[in-house]
Amino acid sequence: CTQNVLLAAAQCAPAETLPVYVKQAAYSIDCFLKDYGEDGCCSEGAQYYRHAALTMFNALDLLCRIAPGVFDDVWTEPKIRNMAEYIVNMHIAGPYYLNFADCSPLAGARGVREFLFGQRVASAPLMTLAARDWADALQQPDPDRLHHPDDSEGINLYYHIQTALAEQKVLAFAQSAAPALPRDMWYPSVGILVCRRGAYALGAKAGNNADSHNHNDVGSVTLYKNGAPLLIDVGVETYSKKTFSPQRYEIWTMQSSWHNLPEFEPESAQYQQQPGLEFAARDVAVSDALDA
């Protein structure tokens, strides 16, 4: 919403009222940022990156264009760079991403906006992932839409303009960029661990059961071998009224039993994890193996 209001204000608002929109937009972005830890992890999962950190990028970029020099320092903030690179760290291979909460493992291909975000924060890994994904999406037929950019790319005229202005630069970068080296990552704000060893990539979830778009998945793991799924999180069903109702956890995809987690059934009673902040991982420790 903030990016779209700024676009409208920049084109239509009288010059004397523009500072009001700038001030409110800065406040809106601050409110958004307070829900992120310094590590930049998106608790909603990789599929929501395009609707969260990436739209924040456009809002910040617009502020920098409307008020030159005022907001430029934001791009050197570690938290902003961490938010930008989150999507790189969750990427496995091809169309696959580690997924938790209401997130599909097919989280969409990266594109021009991600490239521009990477350029702003000087992230070669993000620029590389975005450029290569975009080049692949343009060159390969894709009947299953595994590589196709997110549908949100098609509903905003400004995104089309960004693409038209930057596409040739993105494609040129894709031809020369070396693949980004995968790395291990621990996100303490949400409790997400990413480990890669040889052919294997592991994702593990600590944290709690009060995330945005929460599933009862504390302790769950996903595993990939040679870029293909081995142990999966099935993600979420098609959204319905029930998904965002008090009956949310009657849906099987939300329940702990469907997240590679144990279920206890003493005396015919079934015990599963419950939603809520108090239902959380305890005594979490990350070994030095991440630095190996």
How would you name each of these model-derived features?
Residues G219-V284:
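Active-site rim segments in enzyme catalytic domains, especially the processed small/beta chain
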Residues C1, Y21-S28, C41-T55, W75-M83, ...:
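Secondary-structure capping and boundary motifs in well-ordered enzyme cores
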Residues G37-G45, A67-D72, A210-D211, K241, ...:
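Short helix/strand-bridging catalytic loops that position acidic/His residues to coordinate divalent metals
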Residues C1-Q47, A172-Q175:
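Active-site lining segments of carbohydrate-active enzymes
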Residues Y36, C64-A67, P266, Q270:
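Alpha-helix capping/termination and helix-coil
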Residues C12, A53-L230, D288-A292:
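Carbohydrate-active enzyme catalytic cores, enriched for enzymes
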Residues C1, Y48-Y49, H213-V218, H259-N260:
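Histidine-centered active-site/metal-ligand motif
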